[in-house]
Amino acid sequence: MTDQRRNVYFFHKQDQETNEQARSLTQLAEEHGFTVVNQHSDANIIASIGGDGTFLQAVRKTNFRDDCLYVGITKKGKAHLYCDFHSDEREKMVDAMTFEQIEVRKYPLIEVTVDQASPFHCLNEVSIRSSIIKTFVMDVLIDDLHFETFRGDGMIISTPTGSTAYNKSVAGAVVDPLLPCMQVSELASLNNNTYRTLGSPFVLSSDRKLTLRVVQDGNEHPIIGLDNEALSTRNVKTIEIKLSNKKIKTVKLKDNSFWEKVKRTFL
């Protein structure tokens, strides 16, 4: 698997501690026949040094490439869902690569189109929230058919791997990443005798399209979060969300499954 992939790009924060770890990892990579490159466009392996947040940034800043492998390396021995390697476990990294103790997982992306502009991609989730202290109103359509009119603080639409992040904090379900789907979770929905929403998360298959039409009532400048970045505030009328045909490939240890990571992180 790695025989044809020898060009490595390290993505990391520019602080003294991380720079030292990057230099150490660069030396390790070069000792084992890899070439460390300065531009991510020249790489076929992109390794992030940090936590899950750094991994998300690495994927976004390198344009969600589907022609390379992404590797998560954490700086400290804490549990991370996207990072299978620790920077202080050099021998384990070498053994994993040498003896093929790794496998490649393909993770789906969410594709977000705002008012028919160029689409954005997300690995974890897209969130749409009110930017002012006022109930946010959206018409929710599934495959262009009206499903409900949402009133509340906003919504989160997550991938299976993203289901353990923001989505879980609002009582969304944790979804197996082998299921190609996206989950829709509400933020403080308004439910009474006059207004009604489903009131629970729901899951859409990879063939479905979700459309959110923002009611133009003075609250049409929502905060749109794309993973751990915010989209510039703008007047928004329609947001279309679907599971992208594009996927990223990540390297994971064979003995470190998604559910083992979930158990280690939350239980």
UniProtKB/Swiss-Prot annotation:
Its cofactor is a divalent metal cation. It is found in: Cytoplasm. NAD(+) binds at residues 52-53, 124-125, 151, 153, 164-169, 188. Coiled coil: none annotated. Gene3D superfamilies: Probable inorganic polyphosphate/atp-NAD kinase, domain 1, Probable inorganic polyphosphate/atp-NAD kinase, domain 2. It comes from the Bacteria. One of its GO terms (molecular function) is NAD binding. Signal peptide: none annotated. NCBIfam families: PRK03501.1, PRK04885.1. Involved in the regulation of the intracellular balance of NAD and NADP, and is a key enzyme in the biosynthesis of NADP. Catalyzes specifically the phosphorylation on 2'-hydroxyl of the adenosine moiety of NAD to yield NADP. This is NAD kinase 2. The lineage of its organism: Bacteria, Bacillati, Bacillota, Bacilli, Bacillales.
